[in-house]
Amino acid sequence: MPMSLGNAFIKNFLGKAPDWYKVAIIAFLIINPIVFFLIDPFVAGWLLVAEFIFTLAMALKCYPLQPGGLLAIEAVAIGMTSPAQVKHELVANIEVLLLLVFMVAGIYFMKQLLLFIFTKILLGIRSKTLLSLAFCFAAAFLSAFLDALTVIAVVISVAVGFYSIYHKVASGNPIGDHDHTQDDTITELTRDDLENYRAFLRSLLMHAGVGTALGGVTTMVGEPQNLIIADQAGWFFGEFLIRMAPVTLPVFFCGLITCAIVEKLKICGYGAQLPDNVRQILVDFDREERKTRTNQDVAKLWIQGLIAVWLIAALALHLAAVGLIGLSVIILATSFTGVIEEHSMGKAFEEALPFTALLAVFFAVVAVIIDQELFKPVIDAVLAVEDKSTQLALFYVANGLLSMVSDNVFVGTVYINEVKAALIDGQITREQFDLLAVAINTGTNLPSVATPNGQAAFLFLLTSALAPLIRLSYGRMVIMALPYTIVLAIVGLMGIMFFLEPATAFFYDAGWISPSSGDLAPVVSGGH
């Protein structure tokens, strides 16, 4: 019997998502205006934040852009925020949007070089613990100088390459055109290997993801909010590094120790080894690649290597906005490796553009947080505390908790502006402002690894095409991040409470840094 037109509309709404999920989204859309107009806009604002987090948590059921976008459109329509405020957030974060559009596509054109290097690393280091430490340390080191999103884009690109190589062979297909999203042709014998391989890749990706947070917190270029905080405080690269060190150094070493421990104890989804069959396939693939590599292929690797040097130098020296450097990578890589057809270039943009659209929706939610002043009670309560040491610890905790819920750049920006306003009003001293700036920076960067909401790199990983392939869901990410969340949050808090003030006094006495003075930068707005 043919489907009625009414049923067809219902069936088409959110496609293959479960019926209960569709009902939940419709319920949210009905409830929100009622709460906003009849109960309290503040409550409606927090309800919207909770609903948006729900859509992220259900990312494997339905990509969050559609349900989250419907909620955001309604929020603007009923007046929770304005189109102008959403546009303001997008303009304030244009660099992040450019990064996603161009840099991620640029990385795509360097895939051959990345796969070449990482195949050597993966096959060269047999110990899973050492391999995990290598991924975590490399991601941390790169994130101290590059953007965490760029680093995660590299790791995702490599993981997709590794996954598709094995999947092609396990499916009995030639290393040609193959759909690595379908498991139908895989035999039961290799299915166990595939599950173990997925667990292996999941753990490496999470180690790398946490590595971006460990490295990103240490320098002023590591995360977008670091730049904002450094700008507000008037610190340059060296001073920022030194002022953060009393907190970031203990956290970095404890993070690496945690990496080794979770692998050894095989807890929270870690500890999966690379199956022997998979290793053999990768070894065979590497051997085959070496045999069939022509001079033209070698020339491409050399070109990609030179472009990688340009990429790292340009990012470390901040020669241009990250996205524009990414555009230069696309132009150079395609020009010198002979990719000149439009359809060949189009594939490079497939990965990042859905996430770019999702991030725009996220900024609409951030606009609601700003317009409804959802964080104001927390900020006011913390600023009202008289004891300086307690205030430092509370700032760290409050930043951490809010960064788990919202975008950590937005949280950091809001807090540094509030603290700066307090300094201008004479509520706090310049010395206390400097210490609070450290608490804000570490508070937004470290505990935010708890959920994918806080770190854009984690959110990008969760919503990437790779996540469903290796069965990486929101819940699994939270569980796998848990040991790191506990260690990073507690060690960071200990650093703020016990190491920061004496270490800063020592740095002053040693002449490494001097007490800050002078004008502060103007107020900025921002999300991620």
From Swiss-Prot:
As for subcellular location, the record says: Cell inner membrane
Write down the InterPro entries for this protein, in alphabetical order: Na+/H+_antiporter_NhaB
Name one matching Pfam family.
NhaB
- Has keyword Cell inner membrane? yes
Reactions it catalyzes: 2 Na(+)(in) + 3 H(+)(out) = 2 Na(+)(out) + 3 H(+)(in)
Keywords, ordered alphabetically: Antiport, Cell inner membrane, Cell membrane, Ion transport, Membrane, Sodium, Sodium transport, Transmembrane, Transmembrane helix, Transport
Q: Which GO terms describe its cellular component?
A: plasma membrane
Question: Where, by residue number, does the polypeptide cross the bilayer?
Answer: 23-43, 45-65, 90-110, 136-156, 204-224, 242-262, 305-325, 350-370, 392-412, 450-470, 479-499
Which Gene Ontology molecular-function terms are recorded? sodium:proton antiporter activity
Query: Where does the source fall among the domains of life?
Result: Bacteria
| Topology in the lipid bilayer | Multi-pass membrane protein
Sections of the chain in a coiled coil: none
User: What family classification does the UniProt entry report for this protein?
Assistant: Belongs to the NhaB Na(+)/H(+) (TC 2.A.34) antiporter family.
Checking NCBIfam families in the record gives: NhaB, PRK09547.1
Function according to Swiss-Prot or TrEMBL: Na(+)/H(+) antiporter that extrudes sodium in exchange for external protons.
Q: In its UniProt entry, what is this protein called?
A: Na(+)/H(+) antiporter NhaB
